[in-house]
Amino acid sequence: MRIGVAGLWHETNTFAMEQNDSMETVHIQGGDVLLPQGYVRNFMGGFVEGANHPEVELVPTLGISFSHGGLIHAKVYERCRSMIIDALREAGPLDGVYFAFHGAMVAEAPYLDAEGKLVQEARRILGHIPMVGTYDFHAIMSDYEVESLVPFPNNTNPHIDGYERGLEAAKCLLQMLDGTIQPVTHRVFVPVIGPNIGQSTWSHIPVEERGLLLHQLNLKREALEETPRVINITILGGYGYGDSPDAGMSVVATTDGDAKLAKQLANELARDLWTQRGELQKVRPIYPIDEGVRMAMKRKETPVLLVDLGDDPGSACPADSPVILESLIRNQASDCALTIRDAEVVKAGITAGVGATITMDVGGKIDQRFYQPLQVTGVVKSIDDGKYVICGPTHGGWGRKVVRDTFRETNVGPRIVLRIGNKIDVIFSQRRTGKDRDFFKSAGI
């Protein structure tokens, strides 16, 4: 059996300034490079392991991602879609296809449903062969997709179950190929754009976890999945920053040949979500920056994390906000570490060298709608090439439910550590700021 493998990854913030308006922002992987080598606990790693069968040949085609988190321009999308479709067509006879998606990609009209348009075209040229796909929890899923393939999205937020969903997708595809099952999927759109901080499904703190709406609904979802003939049920968070008709939440249920049951279970969870939607706003309070900094300074347990929801690099924000740094300096905080994306500061620090004192405007240079650059003086503490190893699965997380056995090399480009004020260490990087503790450790913090 020959199974084609293709990928399209992008979480599109349609409000972001940095858009993908040329092929220069496109990253393409092809051939064996597309398939992970060794034991990798992510979607693709799970699928490859699950499809490891003597009679299965995985046929890697193309995987495409993008540099910027903003809107994909129509011409760029058309070119990328054509490249993937051509690669599938040229792969020779295929018995099935696995798509690795993020699921929240938005391109200019008429391609708002970017993944759906790709799946439709793939179905048109490949005919009625079995297809499965893995998706992020924040996927903006459409009816086009569930009509054309069997989806296996994250059940967790923060996302720590990509590997397991990949295994499930592989198992489902192999069973479809041998005729064991005939999946049918039903999707219910729930017109709710939930705040991401209210959409957590688990927590390190048991009492907090019990109060999470999506944790409670996931317990019910897990119980419903034990129903005979049920293959998979998922509550999707959607992605409000991807301004499109399907941006809200949804519930997707897949059964073995029982369309009525799939519809019943999806509707039941969707009703529960809708009637309790107000709970999504009650999870965590949001504090003004100075108040949050002062609260952190009073905490005896460390480390304390300050989360700037307005400049989340994972949601395509510039990651160059200096507002927390400004507050730390103003409140005379000490023993702090943070990251700011600023290529000019990196260049100046490298030129000056370790031990040099520099004065510069930092941050606020990419999107100045909400904050301005901040002038600071600091000592260049270290310089490195930005290559390091992330220990842990997706985003380098350390959730209590994950296996700490994954190591991934990553490269954020040249960076410097600038010590400012009373032991405030700021990592400046040319690309993205880090989403894991190893970003800091590898810089000597």
What residue ranges belong to the model's regions?
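N-terminal amphipathic/basic leader segments beginning at the initiator methionine
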Residues: M1-H53
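Active-site histidine-anchored catalytic micro-motif
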Residues: G4, W9-E11, T25, A74-R81, ...
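Short acidic, glycine/serine/threonine-rich loops at helix termini
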Residues: F15-Q19, I72, A109-Y111, S142-E147, ...
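Low-complexity, highly charged intrinsically disordered N-terminal segments
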Residues: V48-V76, C80-L88
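Glycine-rich phosphate/diphosphate-binding loops that line cofactor/substrate pockets in enzymes
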Residues: H53-V56, P60, D86-D95, G292-V304
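Conserved anion/nucleotide-ligand pocket segment
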Residues: H159, Y163-L219
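Hard-cation-handling environments
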Residues: I197-R431
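A C-terminal functional module that forms or caps the active site or interfaces directly
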Residues: I424-I445
